[in-house]
Amino acid sequence: MMYLAPRDVSPATPPSPALRHHGSKSLYFSMLRERGSGAGRIDELTCLASRHFLSEKLREAATIDAGFPTDLRSLTRVLQDSHDETARGYRSYLDERQAGAPRRYFSCRSHALHFLRTVAPTKLVDGAWLFGLLQRWQDPRLAPLIRIYLEELGCGIAPQNHVLLYKQLLARYGCDQWQDGPDEHFTQGAVQLALAHNADEFLPELIGFNLGYEQLPLHLPITAYELNELNIDPYYFTLHVTIDNASTGHARKAAQSVLDCMPRIGDAADFHRRVGNGYQLNLVGMGTPQAVASFDLEQELRRIIVDKAAVGAQLHSD
């Protein structure tokens, strides 16, 4: 079937200096506040700020080399090679551990819990970037992406809703207080919410972002393995190891959507460039390796003492 280029392959709106003061954290929470006539609607100023924020992050992403293929005809093979490399890397990791090597990520249980809090702003909007596609539910090219979104929501089954699963994980281990984290904790989550609210203007970037996000990274099975070692439920992470596969899972659906949306008539080169830029957008902000490396034992101890002091200050008799 011959498809025309999506109508929103045109260049994104340039940013306005008046809206550059919005930090990732403040914008993140602003985009979570629904205001308007329908579900998921935000006020006009926040929408404008989100668009300019996204433009800035895409310019940052354009400087990153994420190995996106120069020929989309090789996309499936390149992604399969990446998946195979992850599998080999994980097997090598397991061999190292069985030979007596220490954990690669988490030095102790507190380190792991710190990680859960650090990545919470991202995990609690899992799949949100696909929200903006719902109005295009009749477009068969986007049907696989909408299917991914519904699966992220658990297809209406609460125990399978990814955001709910992560909320329950945080509550179970006393990690609910993630809202006071620094601005960099919120960058990737803000990117995902901004894509959700600007899907029309940034459709190629959204498709590329989804492609990158649904690949299976090496850090995911390692994280699950080490959480389990520390007696922390790894189910949220093992679930994603299962569904983000290159055979029949989200990674395969994401790749197929890129190929289906590739314009047969129109500027295919520009579409390719913008999809690649969206793919690289996954690497903007704090990812798992940076979140793991950000742990400081002394700082974490100070945080715990300060929190407990605030609660118990008026409860001592001496």
Give, region by region, the residue ranges found by the protein language model.
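Non-heme di-metal
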Residues: 1-318
